[in-house]
Amino acid sequence: MHIRNPYRDGVDYQALAEAFPALKPHVTVNSDNTTSIDFAVPEAQRLYTAALLHRDFGLTITLPEDRLCPTVPNRLNYVLWVEDILKVTSDALGLPDNRQVKGIDIGTGASAIYPMLACSRFKTWSMVATEVDQKCIDTARLNVIANNLQERLAIIATSVDGPILVPLLQANSDFEYDFTMCNPPFYDGASDMQTSDAAKGFGFGVNAPHTGTVLEMATEGGESAFVAQMVRESLNLQTRCRWFTSNLGKLKSLYEIVGLLREHQISNYAINEYVQGATRRYAIAWSFIDVRLPDHLSRPSNPDLSSLF
């Protein structure tokens, strides 16, 4: 986990339940006095996420039973990496630390987890979040209001068949946005969701059920095709955003996206690797500006990734 992630050493479930009593029925004290939560129970997932967001970020979040429930620790990893990227970029460009930062979250979901975390941590950040699912849009907007973020976080509806980087298409000037974030649909269609276990083992654990819909979790061609479209759209929007970023769940997808960046002669890109237990996930960032990130932000130490640079 990221060095600034407060969950690096795990979570004390009992202490968390004391701070968020609704979680108490799902916390078990084991014979060795350790505590555990059965994340195979969807309600336990939702309450655990709500508890962390409430205790550690002061956020009150509604999480529908039939939509994806995000895990806070690995979502925070991504936010912290983006923060690091922006810090290096601001220093290189001579921009003030207290400047207004504006970002985009693609496919924000019902929780709007990324912009919620970002806006709660950084008071000078504002975000536009896109979503195609109407129930997710409605719930995310309620979450924005519940946390008094209307002035800093806008949820906009987009289309499955339309462009992905809609806010950039509507931008009025160069570098109007500092970054994009995205947790793309992982699966290649509903059948892939039924047969693949590749997305398990990260977040709530291998036995935890997925509560998301096909619209949230699947797209034709899977995550690689989705992010590839982002890359192609960025070619015409390059000066409107400093850094384009996205999560990736599969190593194969990472290789495909790096290959596409190279094909378009985009040499300014960075990779991040998240490790949780035996499972690895990745993030990719690319840019058309002259600022190059240091190796500790852009080149994971994993030797299996060395051919990507």
UniProtKB/Swiss-Prot annotation:
The conserved NPPF motif is required for catalysis and represent the basis of substrate specificity toward norbaeocystin. Keywords: Magnesium, Metal-binding, Methyltransferase, S-adenosyl-L-methionine, Transferase. Belongs to the methyltransferase superfamily. METTL16/RlmF family. Monomer. It catalyses: norbaeocystin + 2 S-adenosyl-L-methionine = psilocybin + 2 S-adenosyl-L-homocysteine + 2 H(+); norbaeocystin + S-adenosyl-L-methionine = baeocystin + S-adenosyl-L-homocysteine + H(+); baeocystin + S-adenosyl-L-methionine = psilocybin + S-adenosyl-L-homocysteine + H(+). GO terms for biological process: psilocybin biosynthetic process; rRNA base methylation. InterPro entries: METTL16/PsiM, METTL16/RlmF, SAM-dependent_MTases_sf. Pathway: Secondary metabolite biosynthesis. S-adenosyl-L-homocysteine binds at R75, G107, E131, T158, N183. It is an enzyme of class 2 (transferase). GO terms for molecular function: 4-hydroxytryptamine 4-phosphate methyltransferase activity. It comes from Psilocybe cyanescens. Baeocystin binds at R75, N183, P184, Y187, G203, R281. This is Psilocybin synthase. Its EC number is 2.1.1.-, 2.1.1.345. Mg(2+) 1 binds at G58.
